[in-house]
Design a protein with these regions (language model features):
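A shared catalytic/ligand-binding motif for oxyanion handling
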Residues: 1-202
Length: 202
């Protein structure tokens, strides 16, 4: 964080079963601990920004919503760990319902939105022109949320996004599987403030 001079960061798959395990000087850390296998999310904000926890989900889904003020702009930062593609609709629903609710609520209150998450979604070339996969079932659900709330998919802004692949896996048969399932979404009012999105699949 110091080398990047970051004020806000988001981490998924912390695998934390209890809060308070991690500490970072001059940051307030918000965690959604994982009650089942895998997962766990964290959102850290510089103490100088006086962050306030808006919502925390950690039972049926993982989602953290924190608000802070930068200049005159009130921004809601959202991170989380999306449901697996092969889960039933009943298991997927809590995450997407919570995500849409938090986005809609923030917009109705005049807040800007910045979302970075392990979405477990393939959005396809509709949103990410060089995506190597077609839109998946989870992608269809997220697509509805994007359209309903007029969000910008930063991964798809080719002039600002450094790469497409966010996940790379080497199989036992020597193949390399690549995907773009980690996404950054912002409210339309933040698009012009974005300088770049640097992606490292390693």
């Amino acid at each position: 964080m110091k080398s990047k001079n970051a004020s806000v960061f988001m981490v998924q798959e912390t695998n934390a079963r209890k809060n308070g395990k991690h500490q970072l000087d001059n940051f307030v850390l918000f965690e959604s601990k994982r009650t089942k296998m895998g997962g766990g999310s964290m959102l850290g904000v510089s103490k100088d920004l006086n962050p306030v926890l808006v919502s925390l989900y950690e039972n049926d889904c993982e989602l953290i919503v924190v608000e802070t003020k930068i200049g005159r702009r009130e921004i809601r930062f959202i991170t989380g760990y999306g449901p697996q593609e092969d889960w039933s609709d009943d298991l997927k629903a809590p995450f997407f319902v919570a995500l849409n609710t938090e986005i809609s609520k923030a917009l109705s209150e005049g807040k800007s939105i910045y979302i970075a998450m392990d979405a477990k979604c393939k959005l396809g070339t509709t949103y990410i022109p060089k995506d190597m996969h077609n839109m998946s079932k989870n992608g269809e659900i997220l697509s509805n949320i994007i359209e309903t709330n007029a969000l910008i998919v930063v991964n798809g802004l080719e002039q600002k996004c450094s790469s497409v692949v966010t996940r790379q896996r080497h199989t036992e048969y020597g193949r390399v599987e690549e995907s773009a399932i980690d996404v950054v979404l912002v409210s339309a009012d933040l698009e012009d403030y974005l300088v770049s999105l640097n992606i490292c699949s390693n």
